[in-house]
């Protein structure tokens, strides 16, 4: 396992290079909760035949925060999963870019990305699946959900598929929604304060993507106090 804690108070660029040999496996858990400064975090990963990689990414927006996850399948029968949960508080920004480059046969990628934006927060997600002509038998799935919880939020989502082979299984989807005012009204009518209601809804929305070995600390940092 690789546990990565990215907490940079000032402006910073953090680069992580991972090269996985044949039939290797890695669970990569990353927490990045600093909300001040401008940050750029890049992860490059190259997977040889039979390698298996899982990333559990937990992140809060900062003055400007961009994360790039670049996965290159250089060997057949390799698998990569990117599971990410993010929150953006007032006047904070988060930009997550994920590229899965399938250049060899029978490779598999799964992206599951969930973001919650609070008042005046801004979040962007761009997920790209690229399958080359000779990469037959690939399976690539992308699911992205974003929730606006407050006024004046900005949410951008752009899932992309670029496929040059017919013998593949691929799907991608992105949904953007606002917090259900009916739910809020019901909860407040039962004596639950608005701040606590927002916390409950946020925790329910991010339940599936706060995962992996650092999930306990991620929950305490990403979910607002009740």
Q: What positions do the PLM features span?
A:
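Conserved beta-strand/loop scaffold segments within soluble protein domains that form the structured core
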Residues: 1-185, 189-192, 206-208, 213-226
